[in-house]
C-alpha cells in the first residue's frame, strides 16, 4: 500500500485463522492455521491509522495478545458459516477487505448433539461451505 492509497482506505475488514466444522460436541474438522498472517496484516493497517475489523477464527490468544488499539475490533468466530455471516454484516461498512483466513471448504452435513460413541466405522457426509 502506498501513501496515496492509505488516504482512501480508512476501514478494513481482515479475516484470519482457521475455521472448525463441528462433528459433535467434542470433535471437529479443522486445520492448523495460526492466524499469524492476518494478525500481522491487522497490525500493519493499525500502524497506518486504519480502523480494523478483524474476524478471527479459533487461534491461541498468545498470537494476538499484543494487538491492542482503539481502532481495532475483533469478532471471534468458530465455523465457516459464522465467518461468512460476520463478514457479510461487516463488509458493507468497510473500504477494503483482506481475506486470509483458512476457511474450511467442507462441513459435515449433520452434527450430533451428543458425543458420538465409538463403535466400528464412522461415515461423515461433507457438503461445501458457503463462499
Residue locations for each model-derived region?
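A cross-family phosphate/adenosyl-ligand binding-site feature
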Residues: 1-131
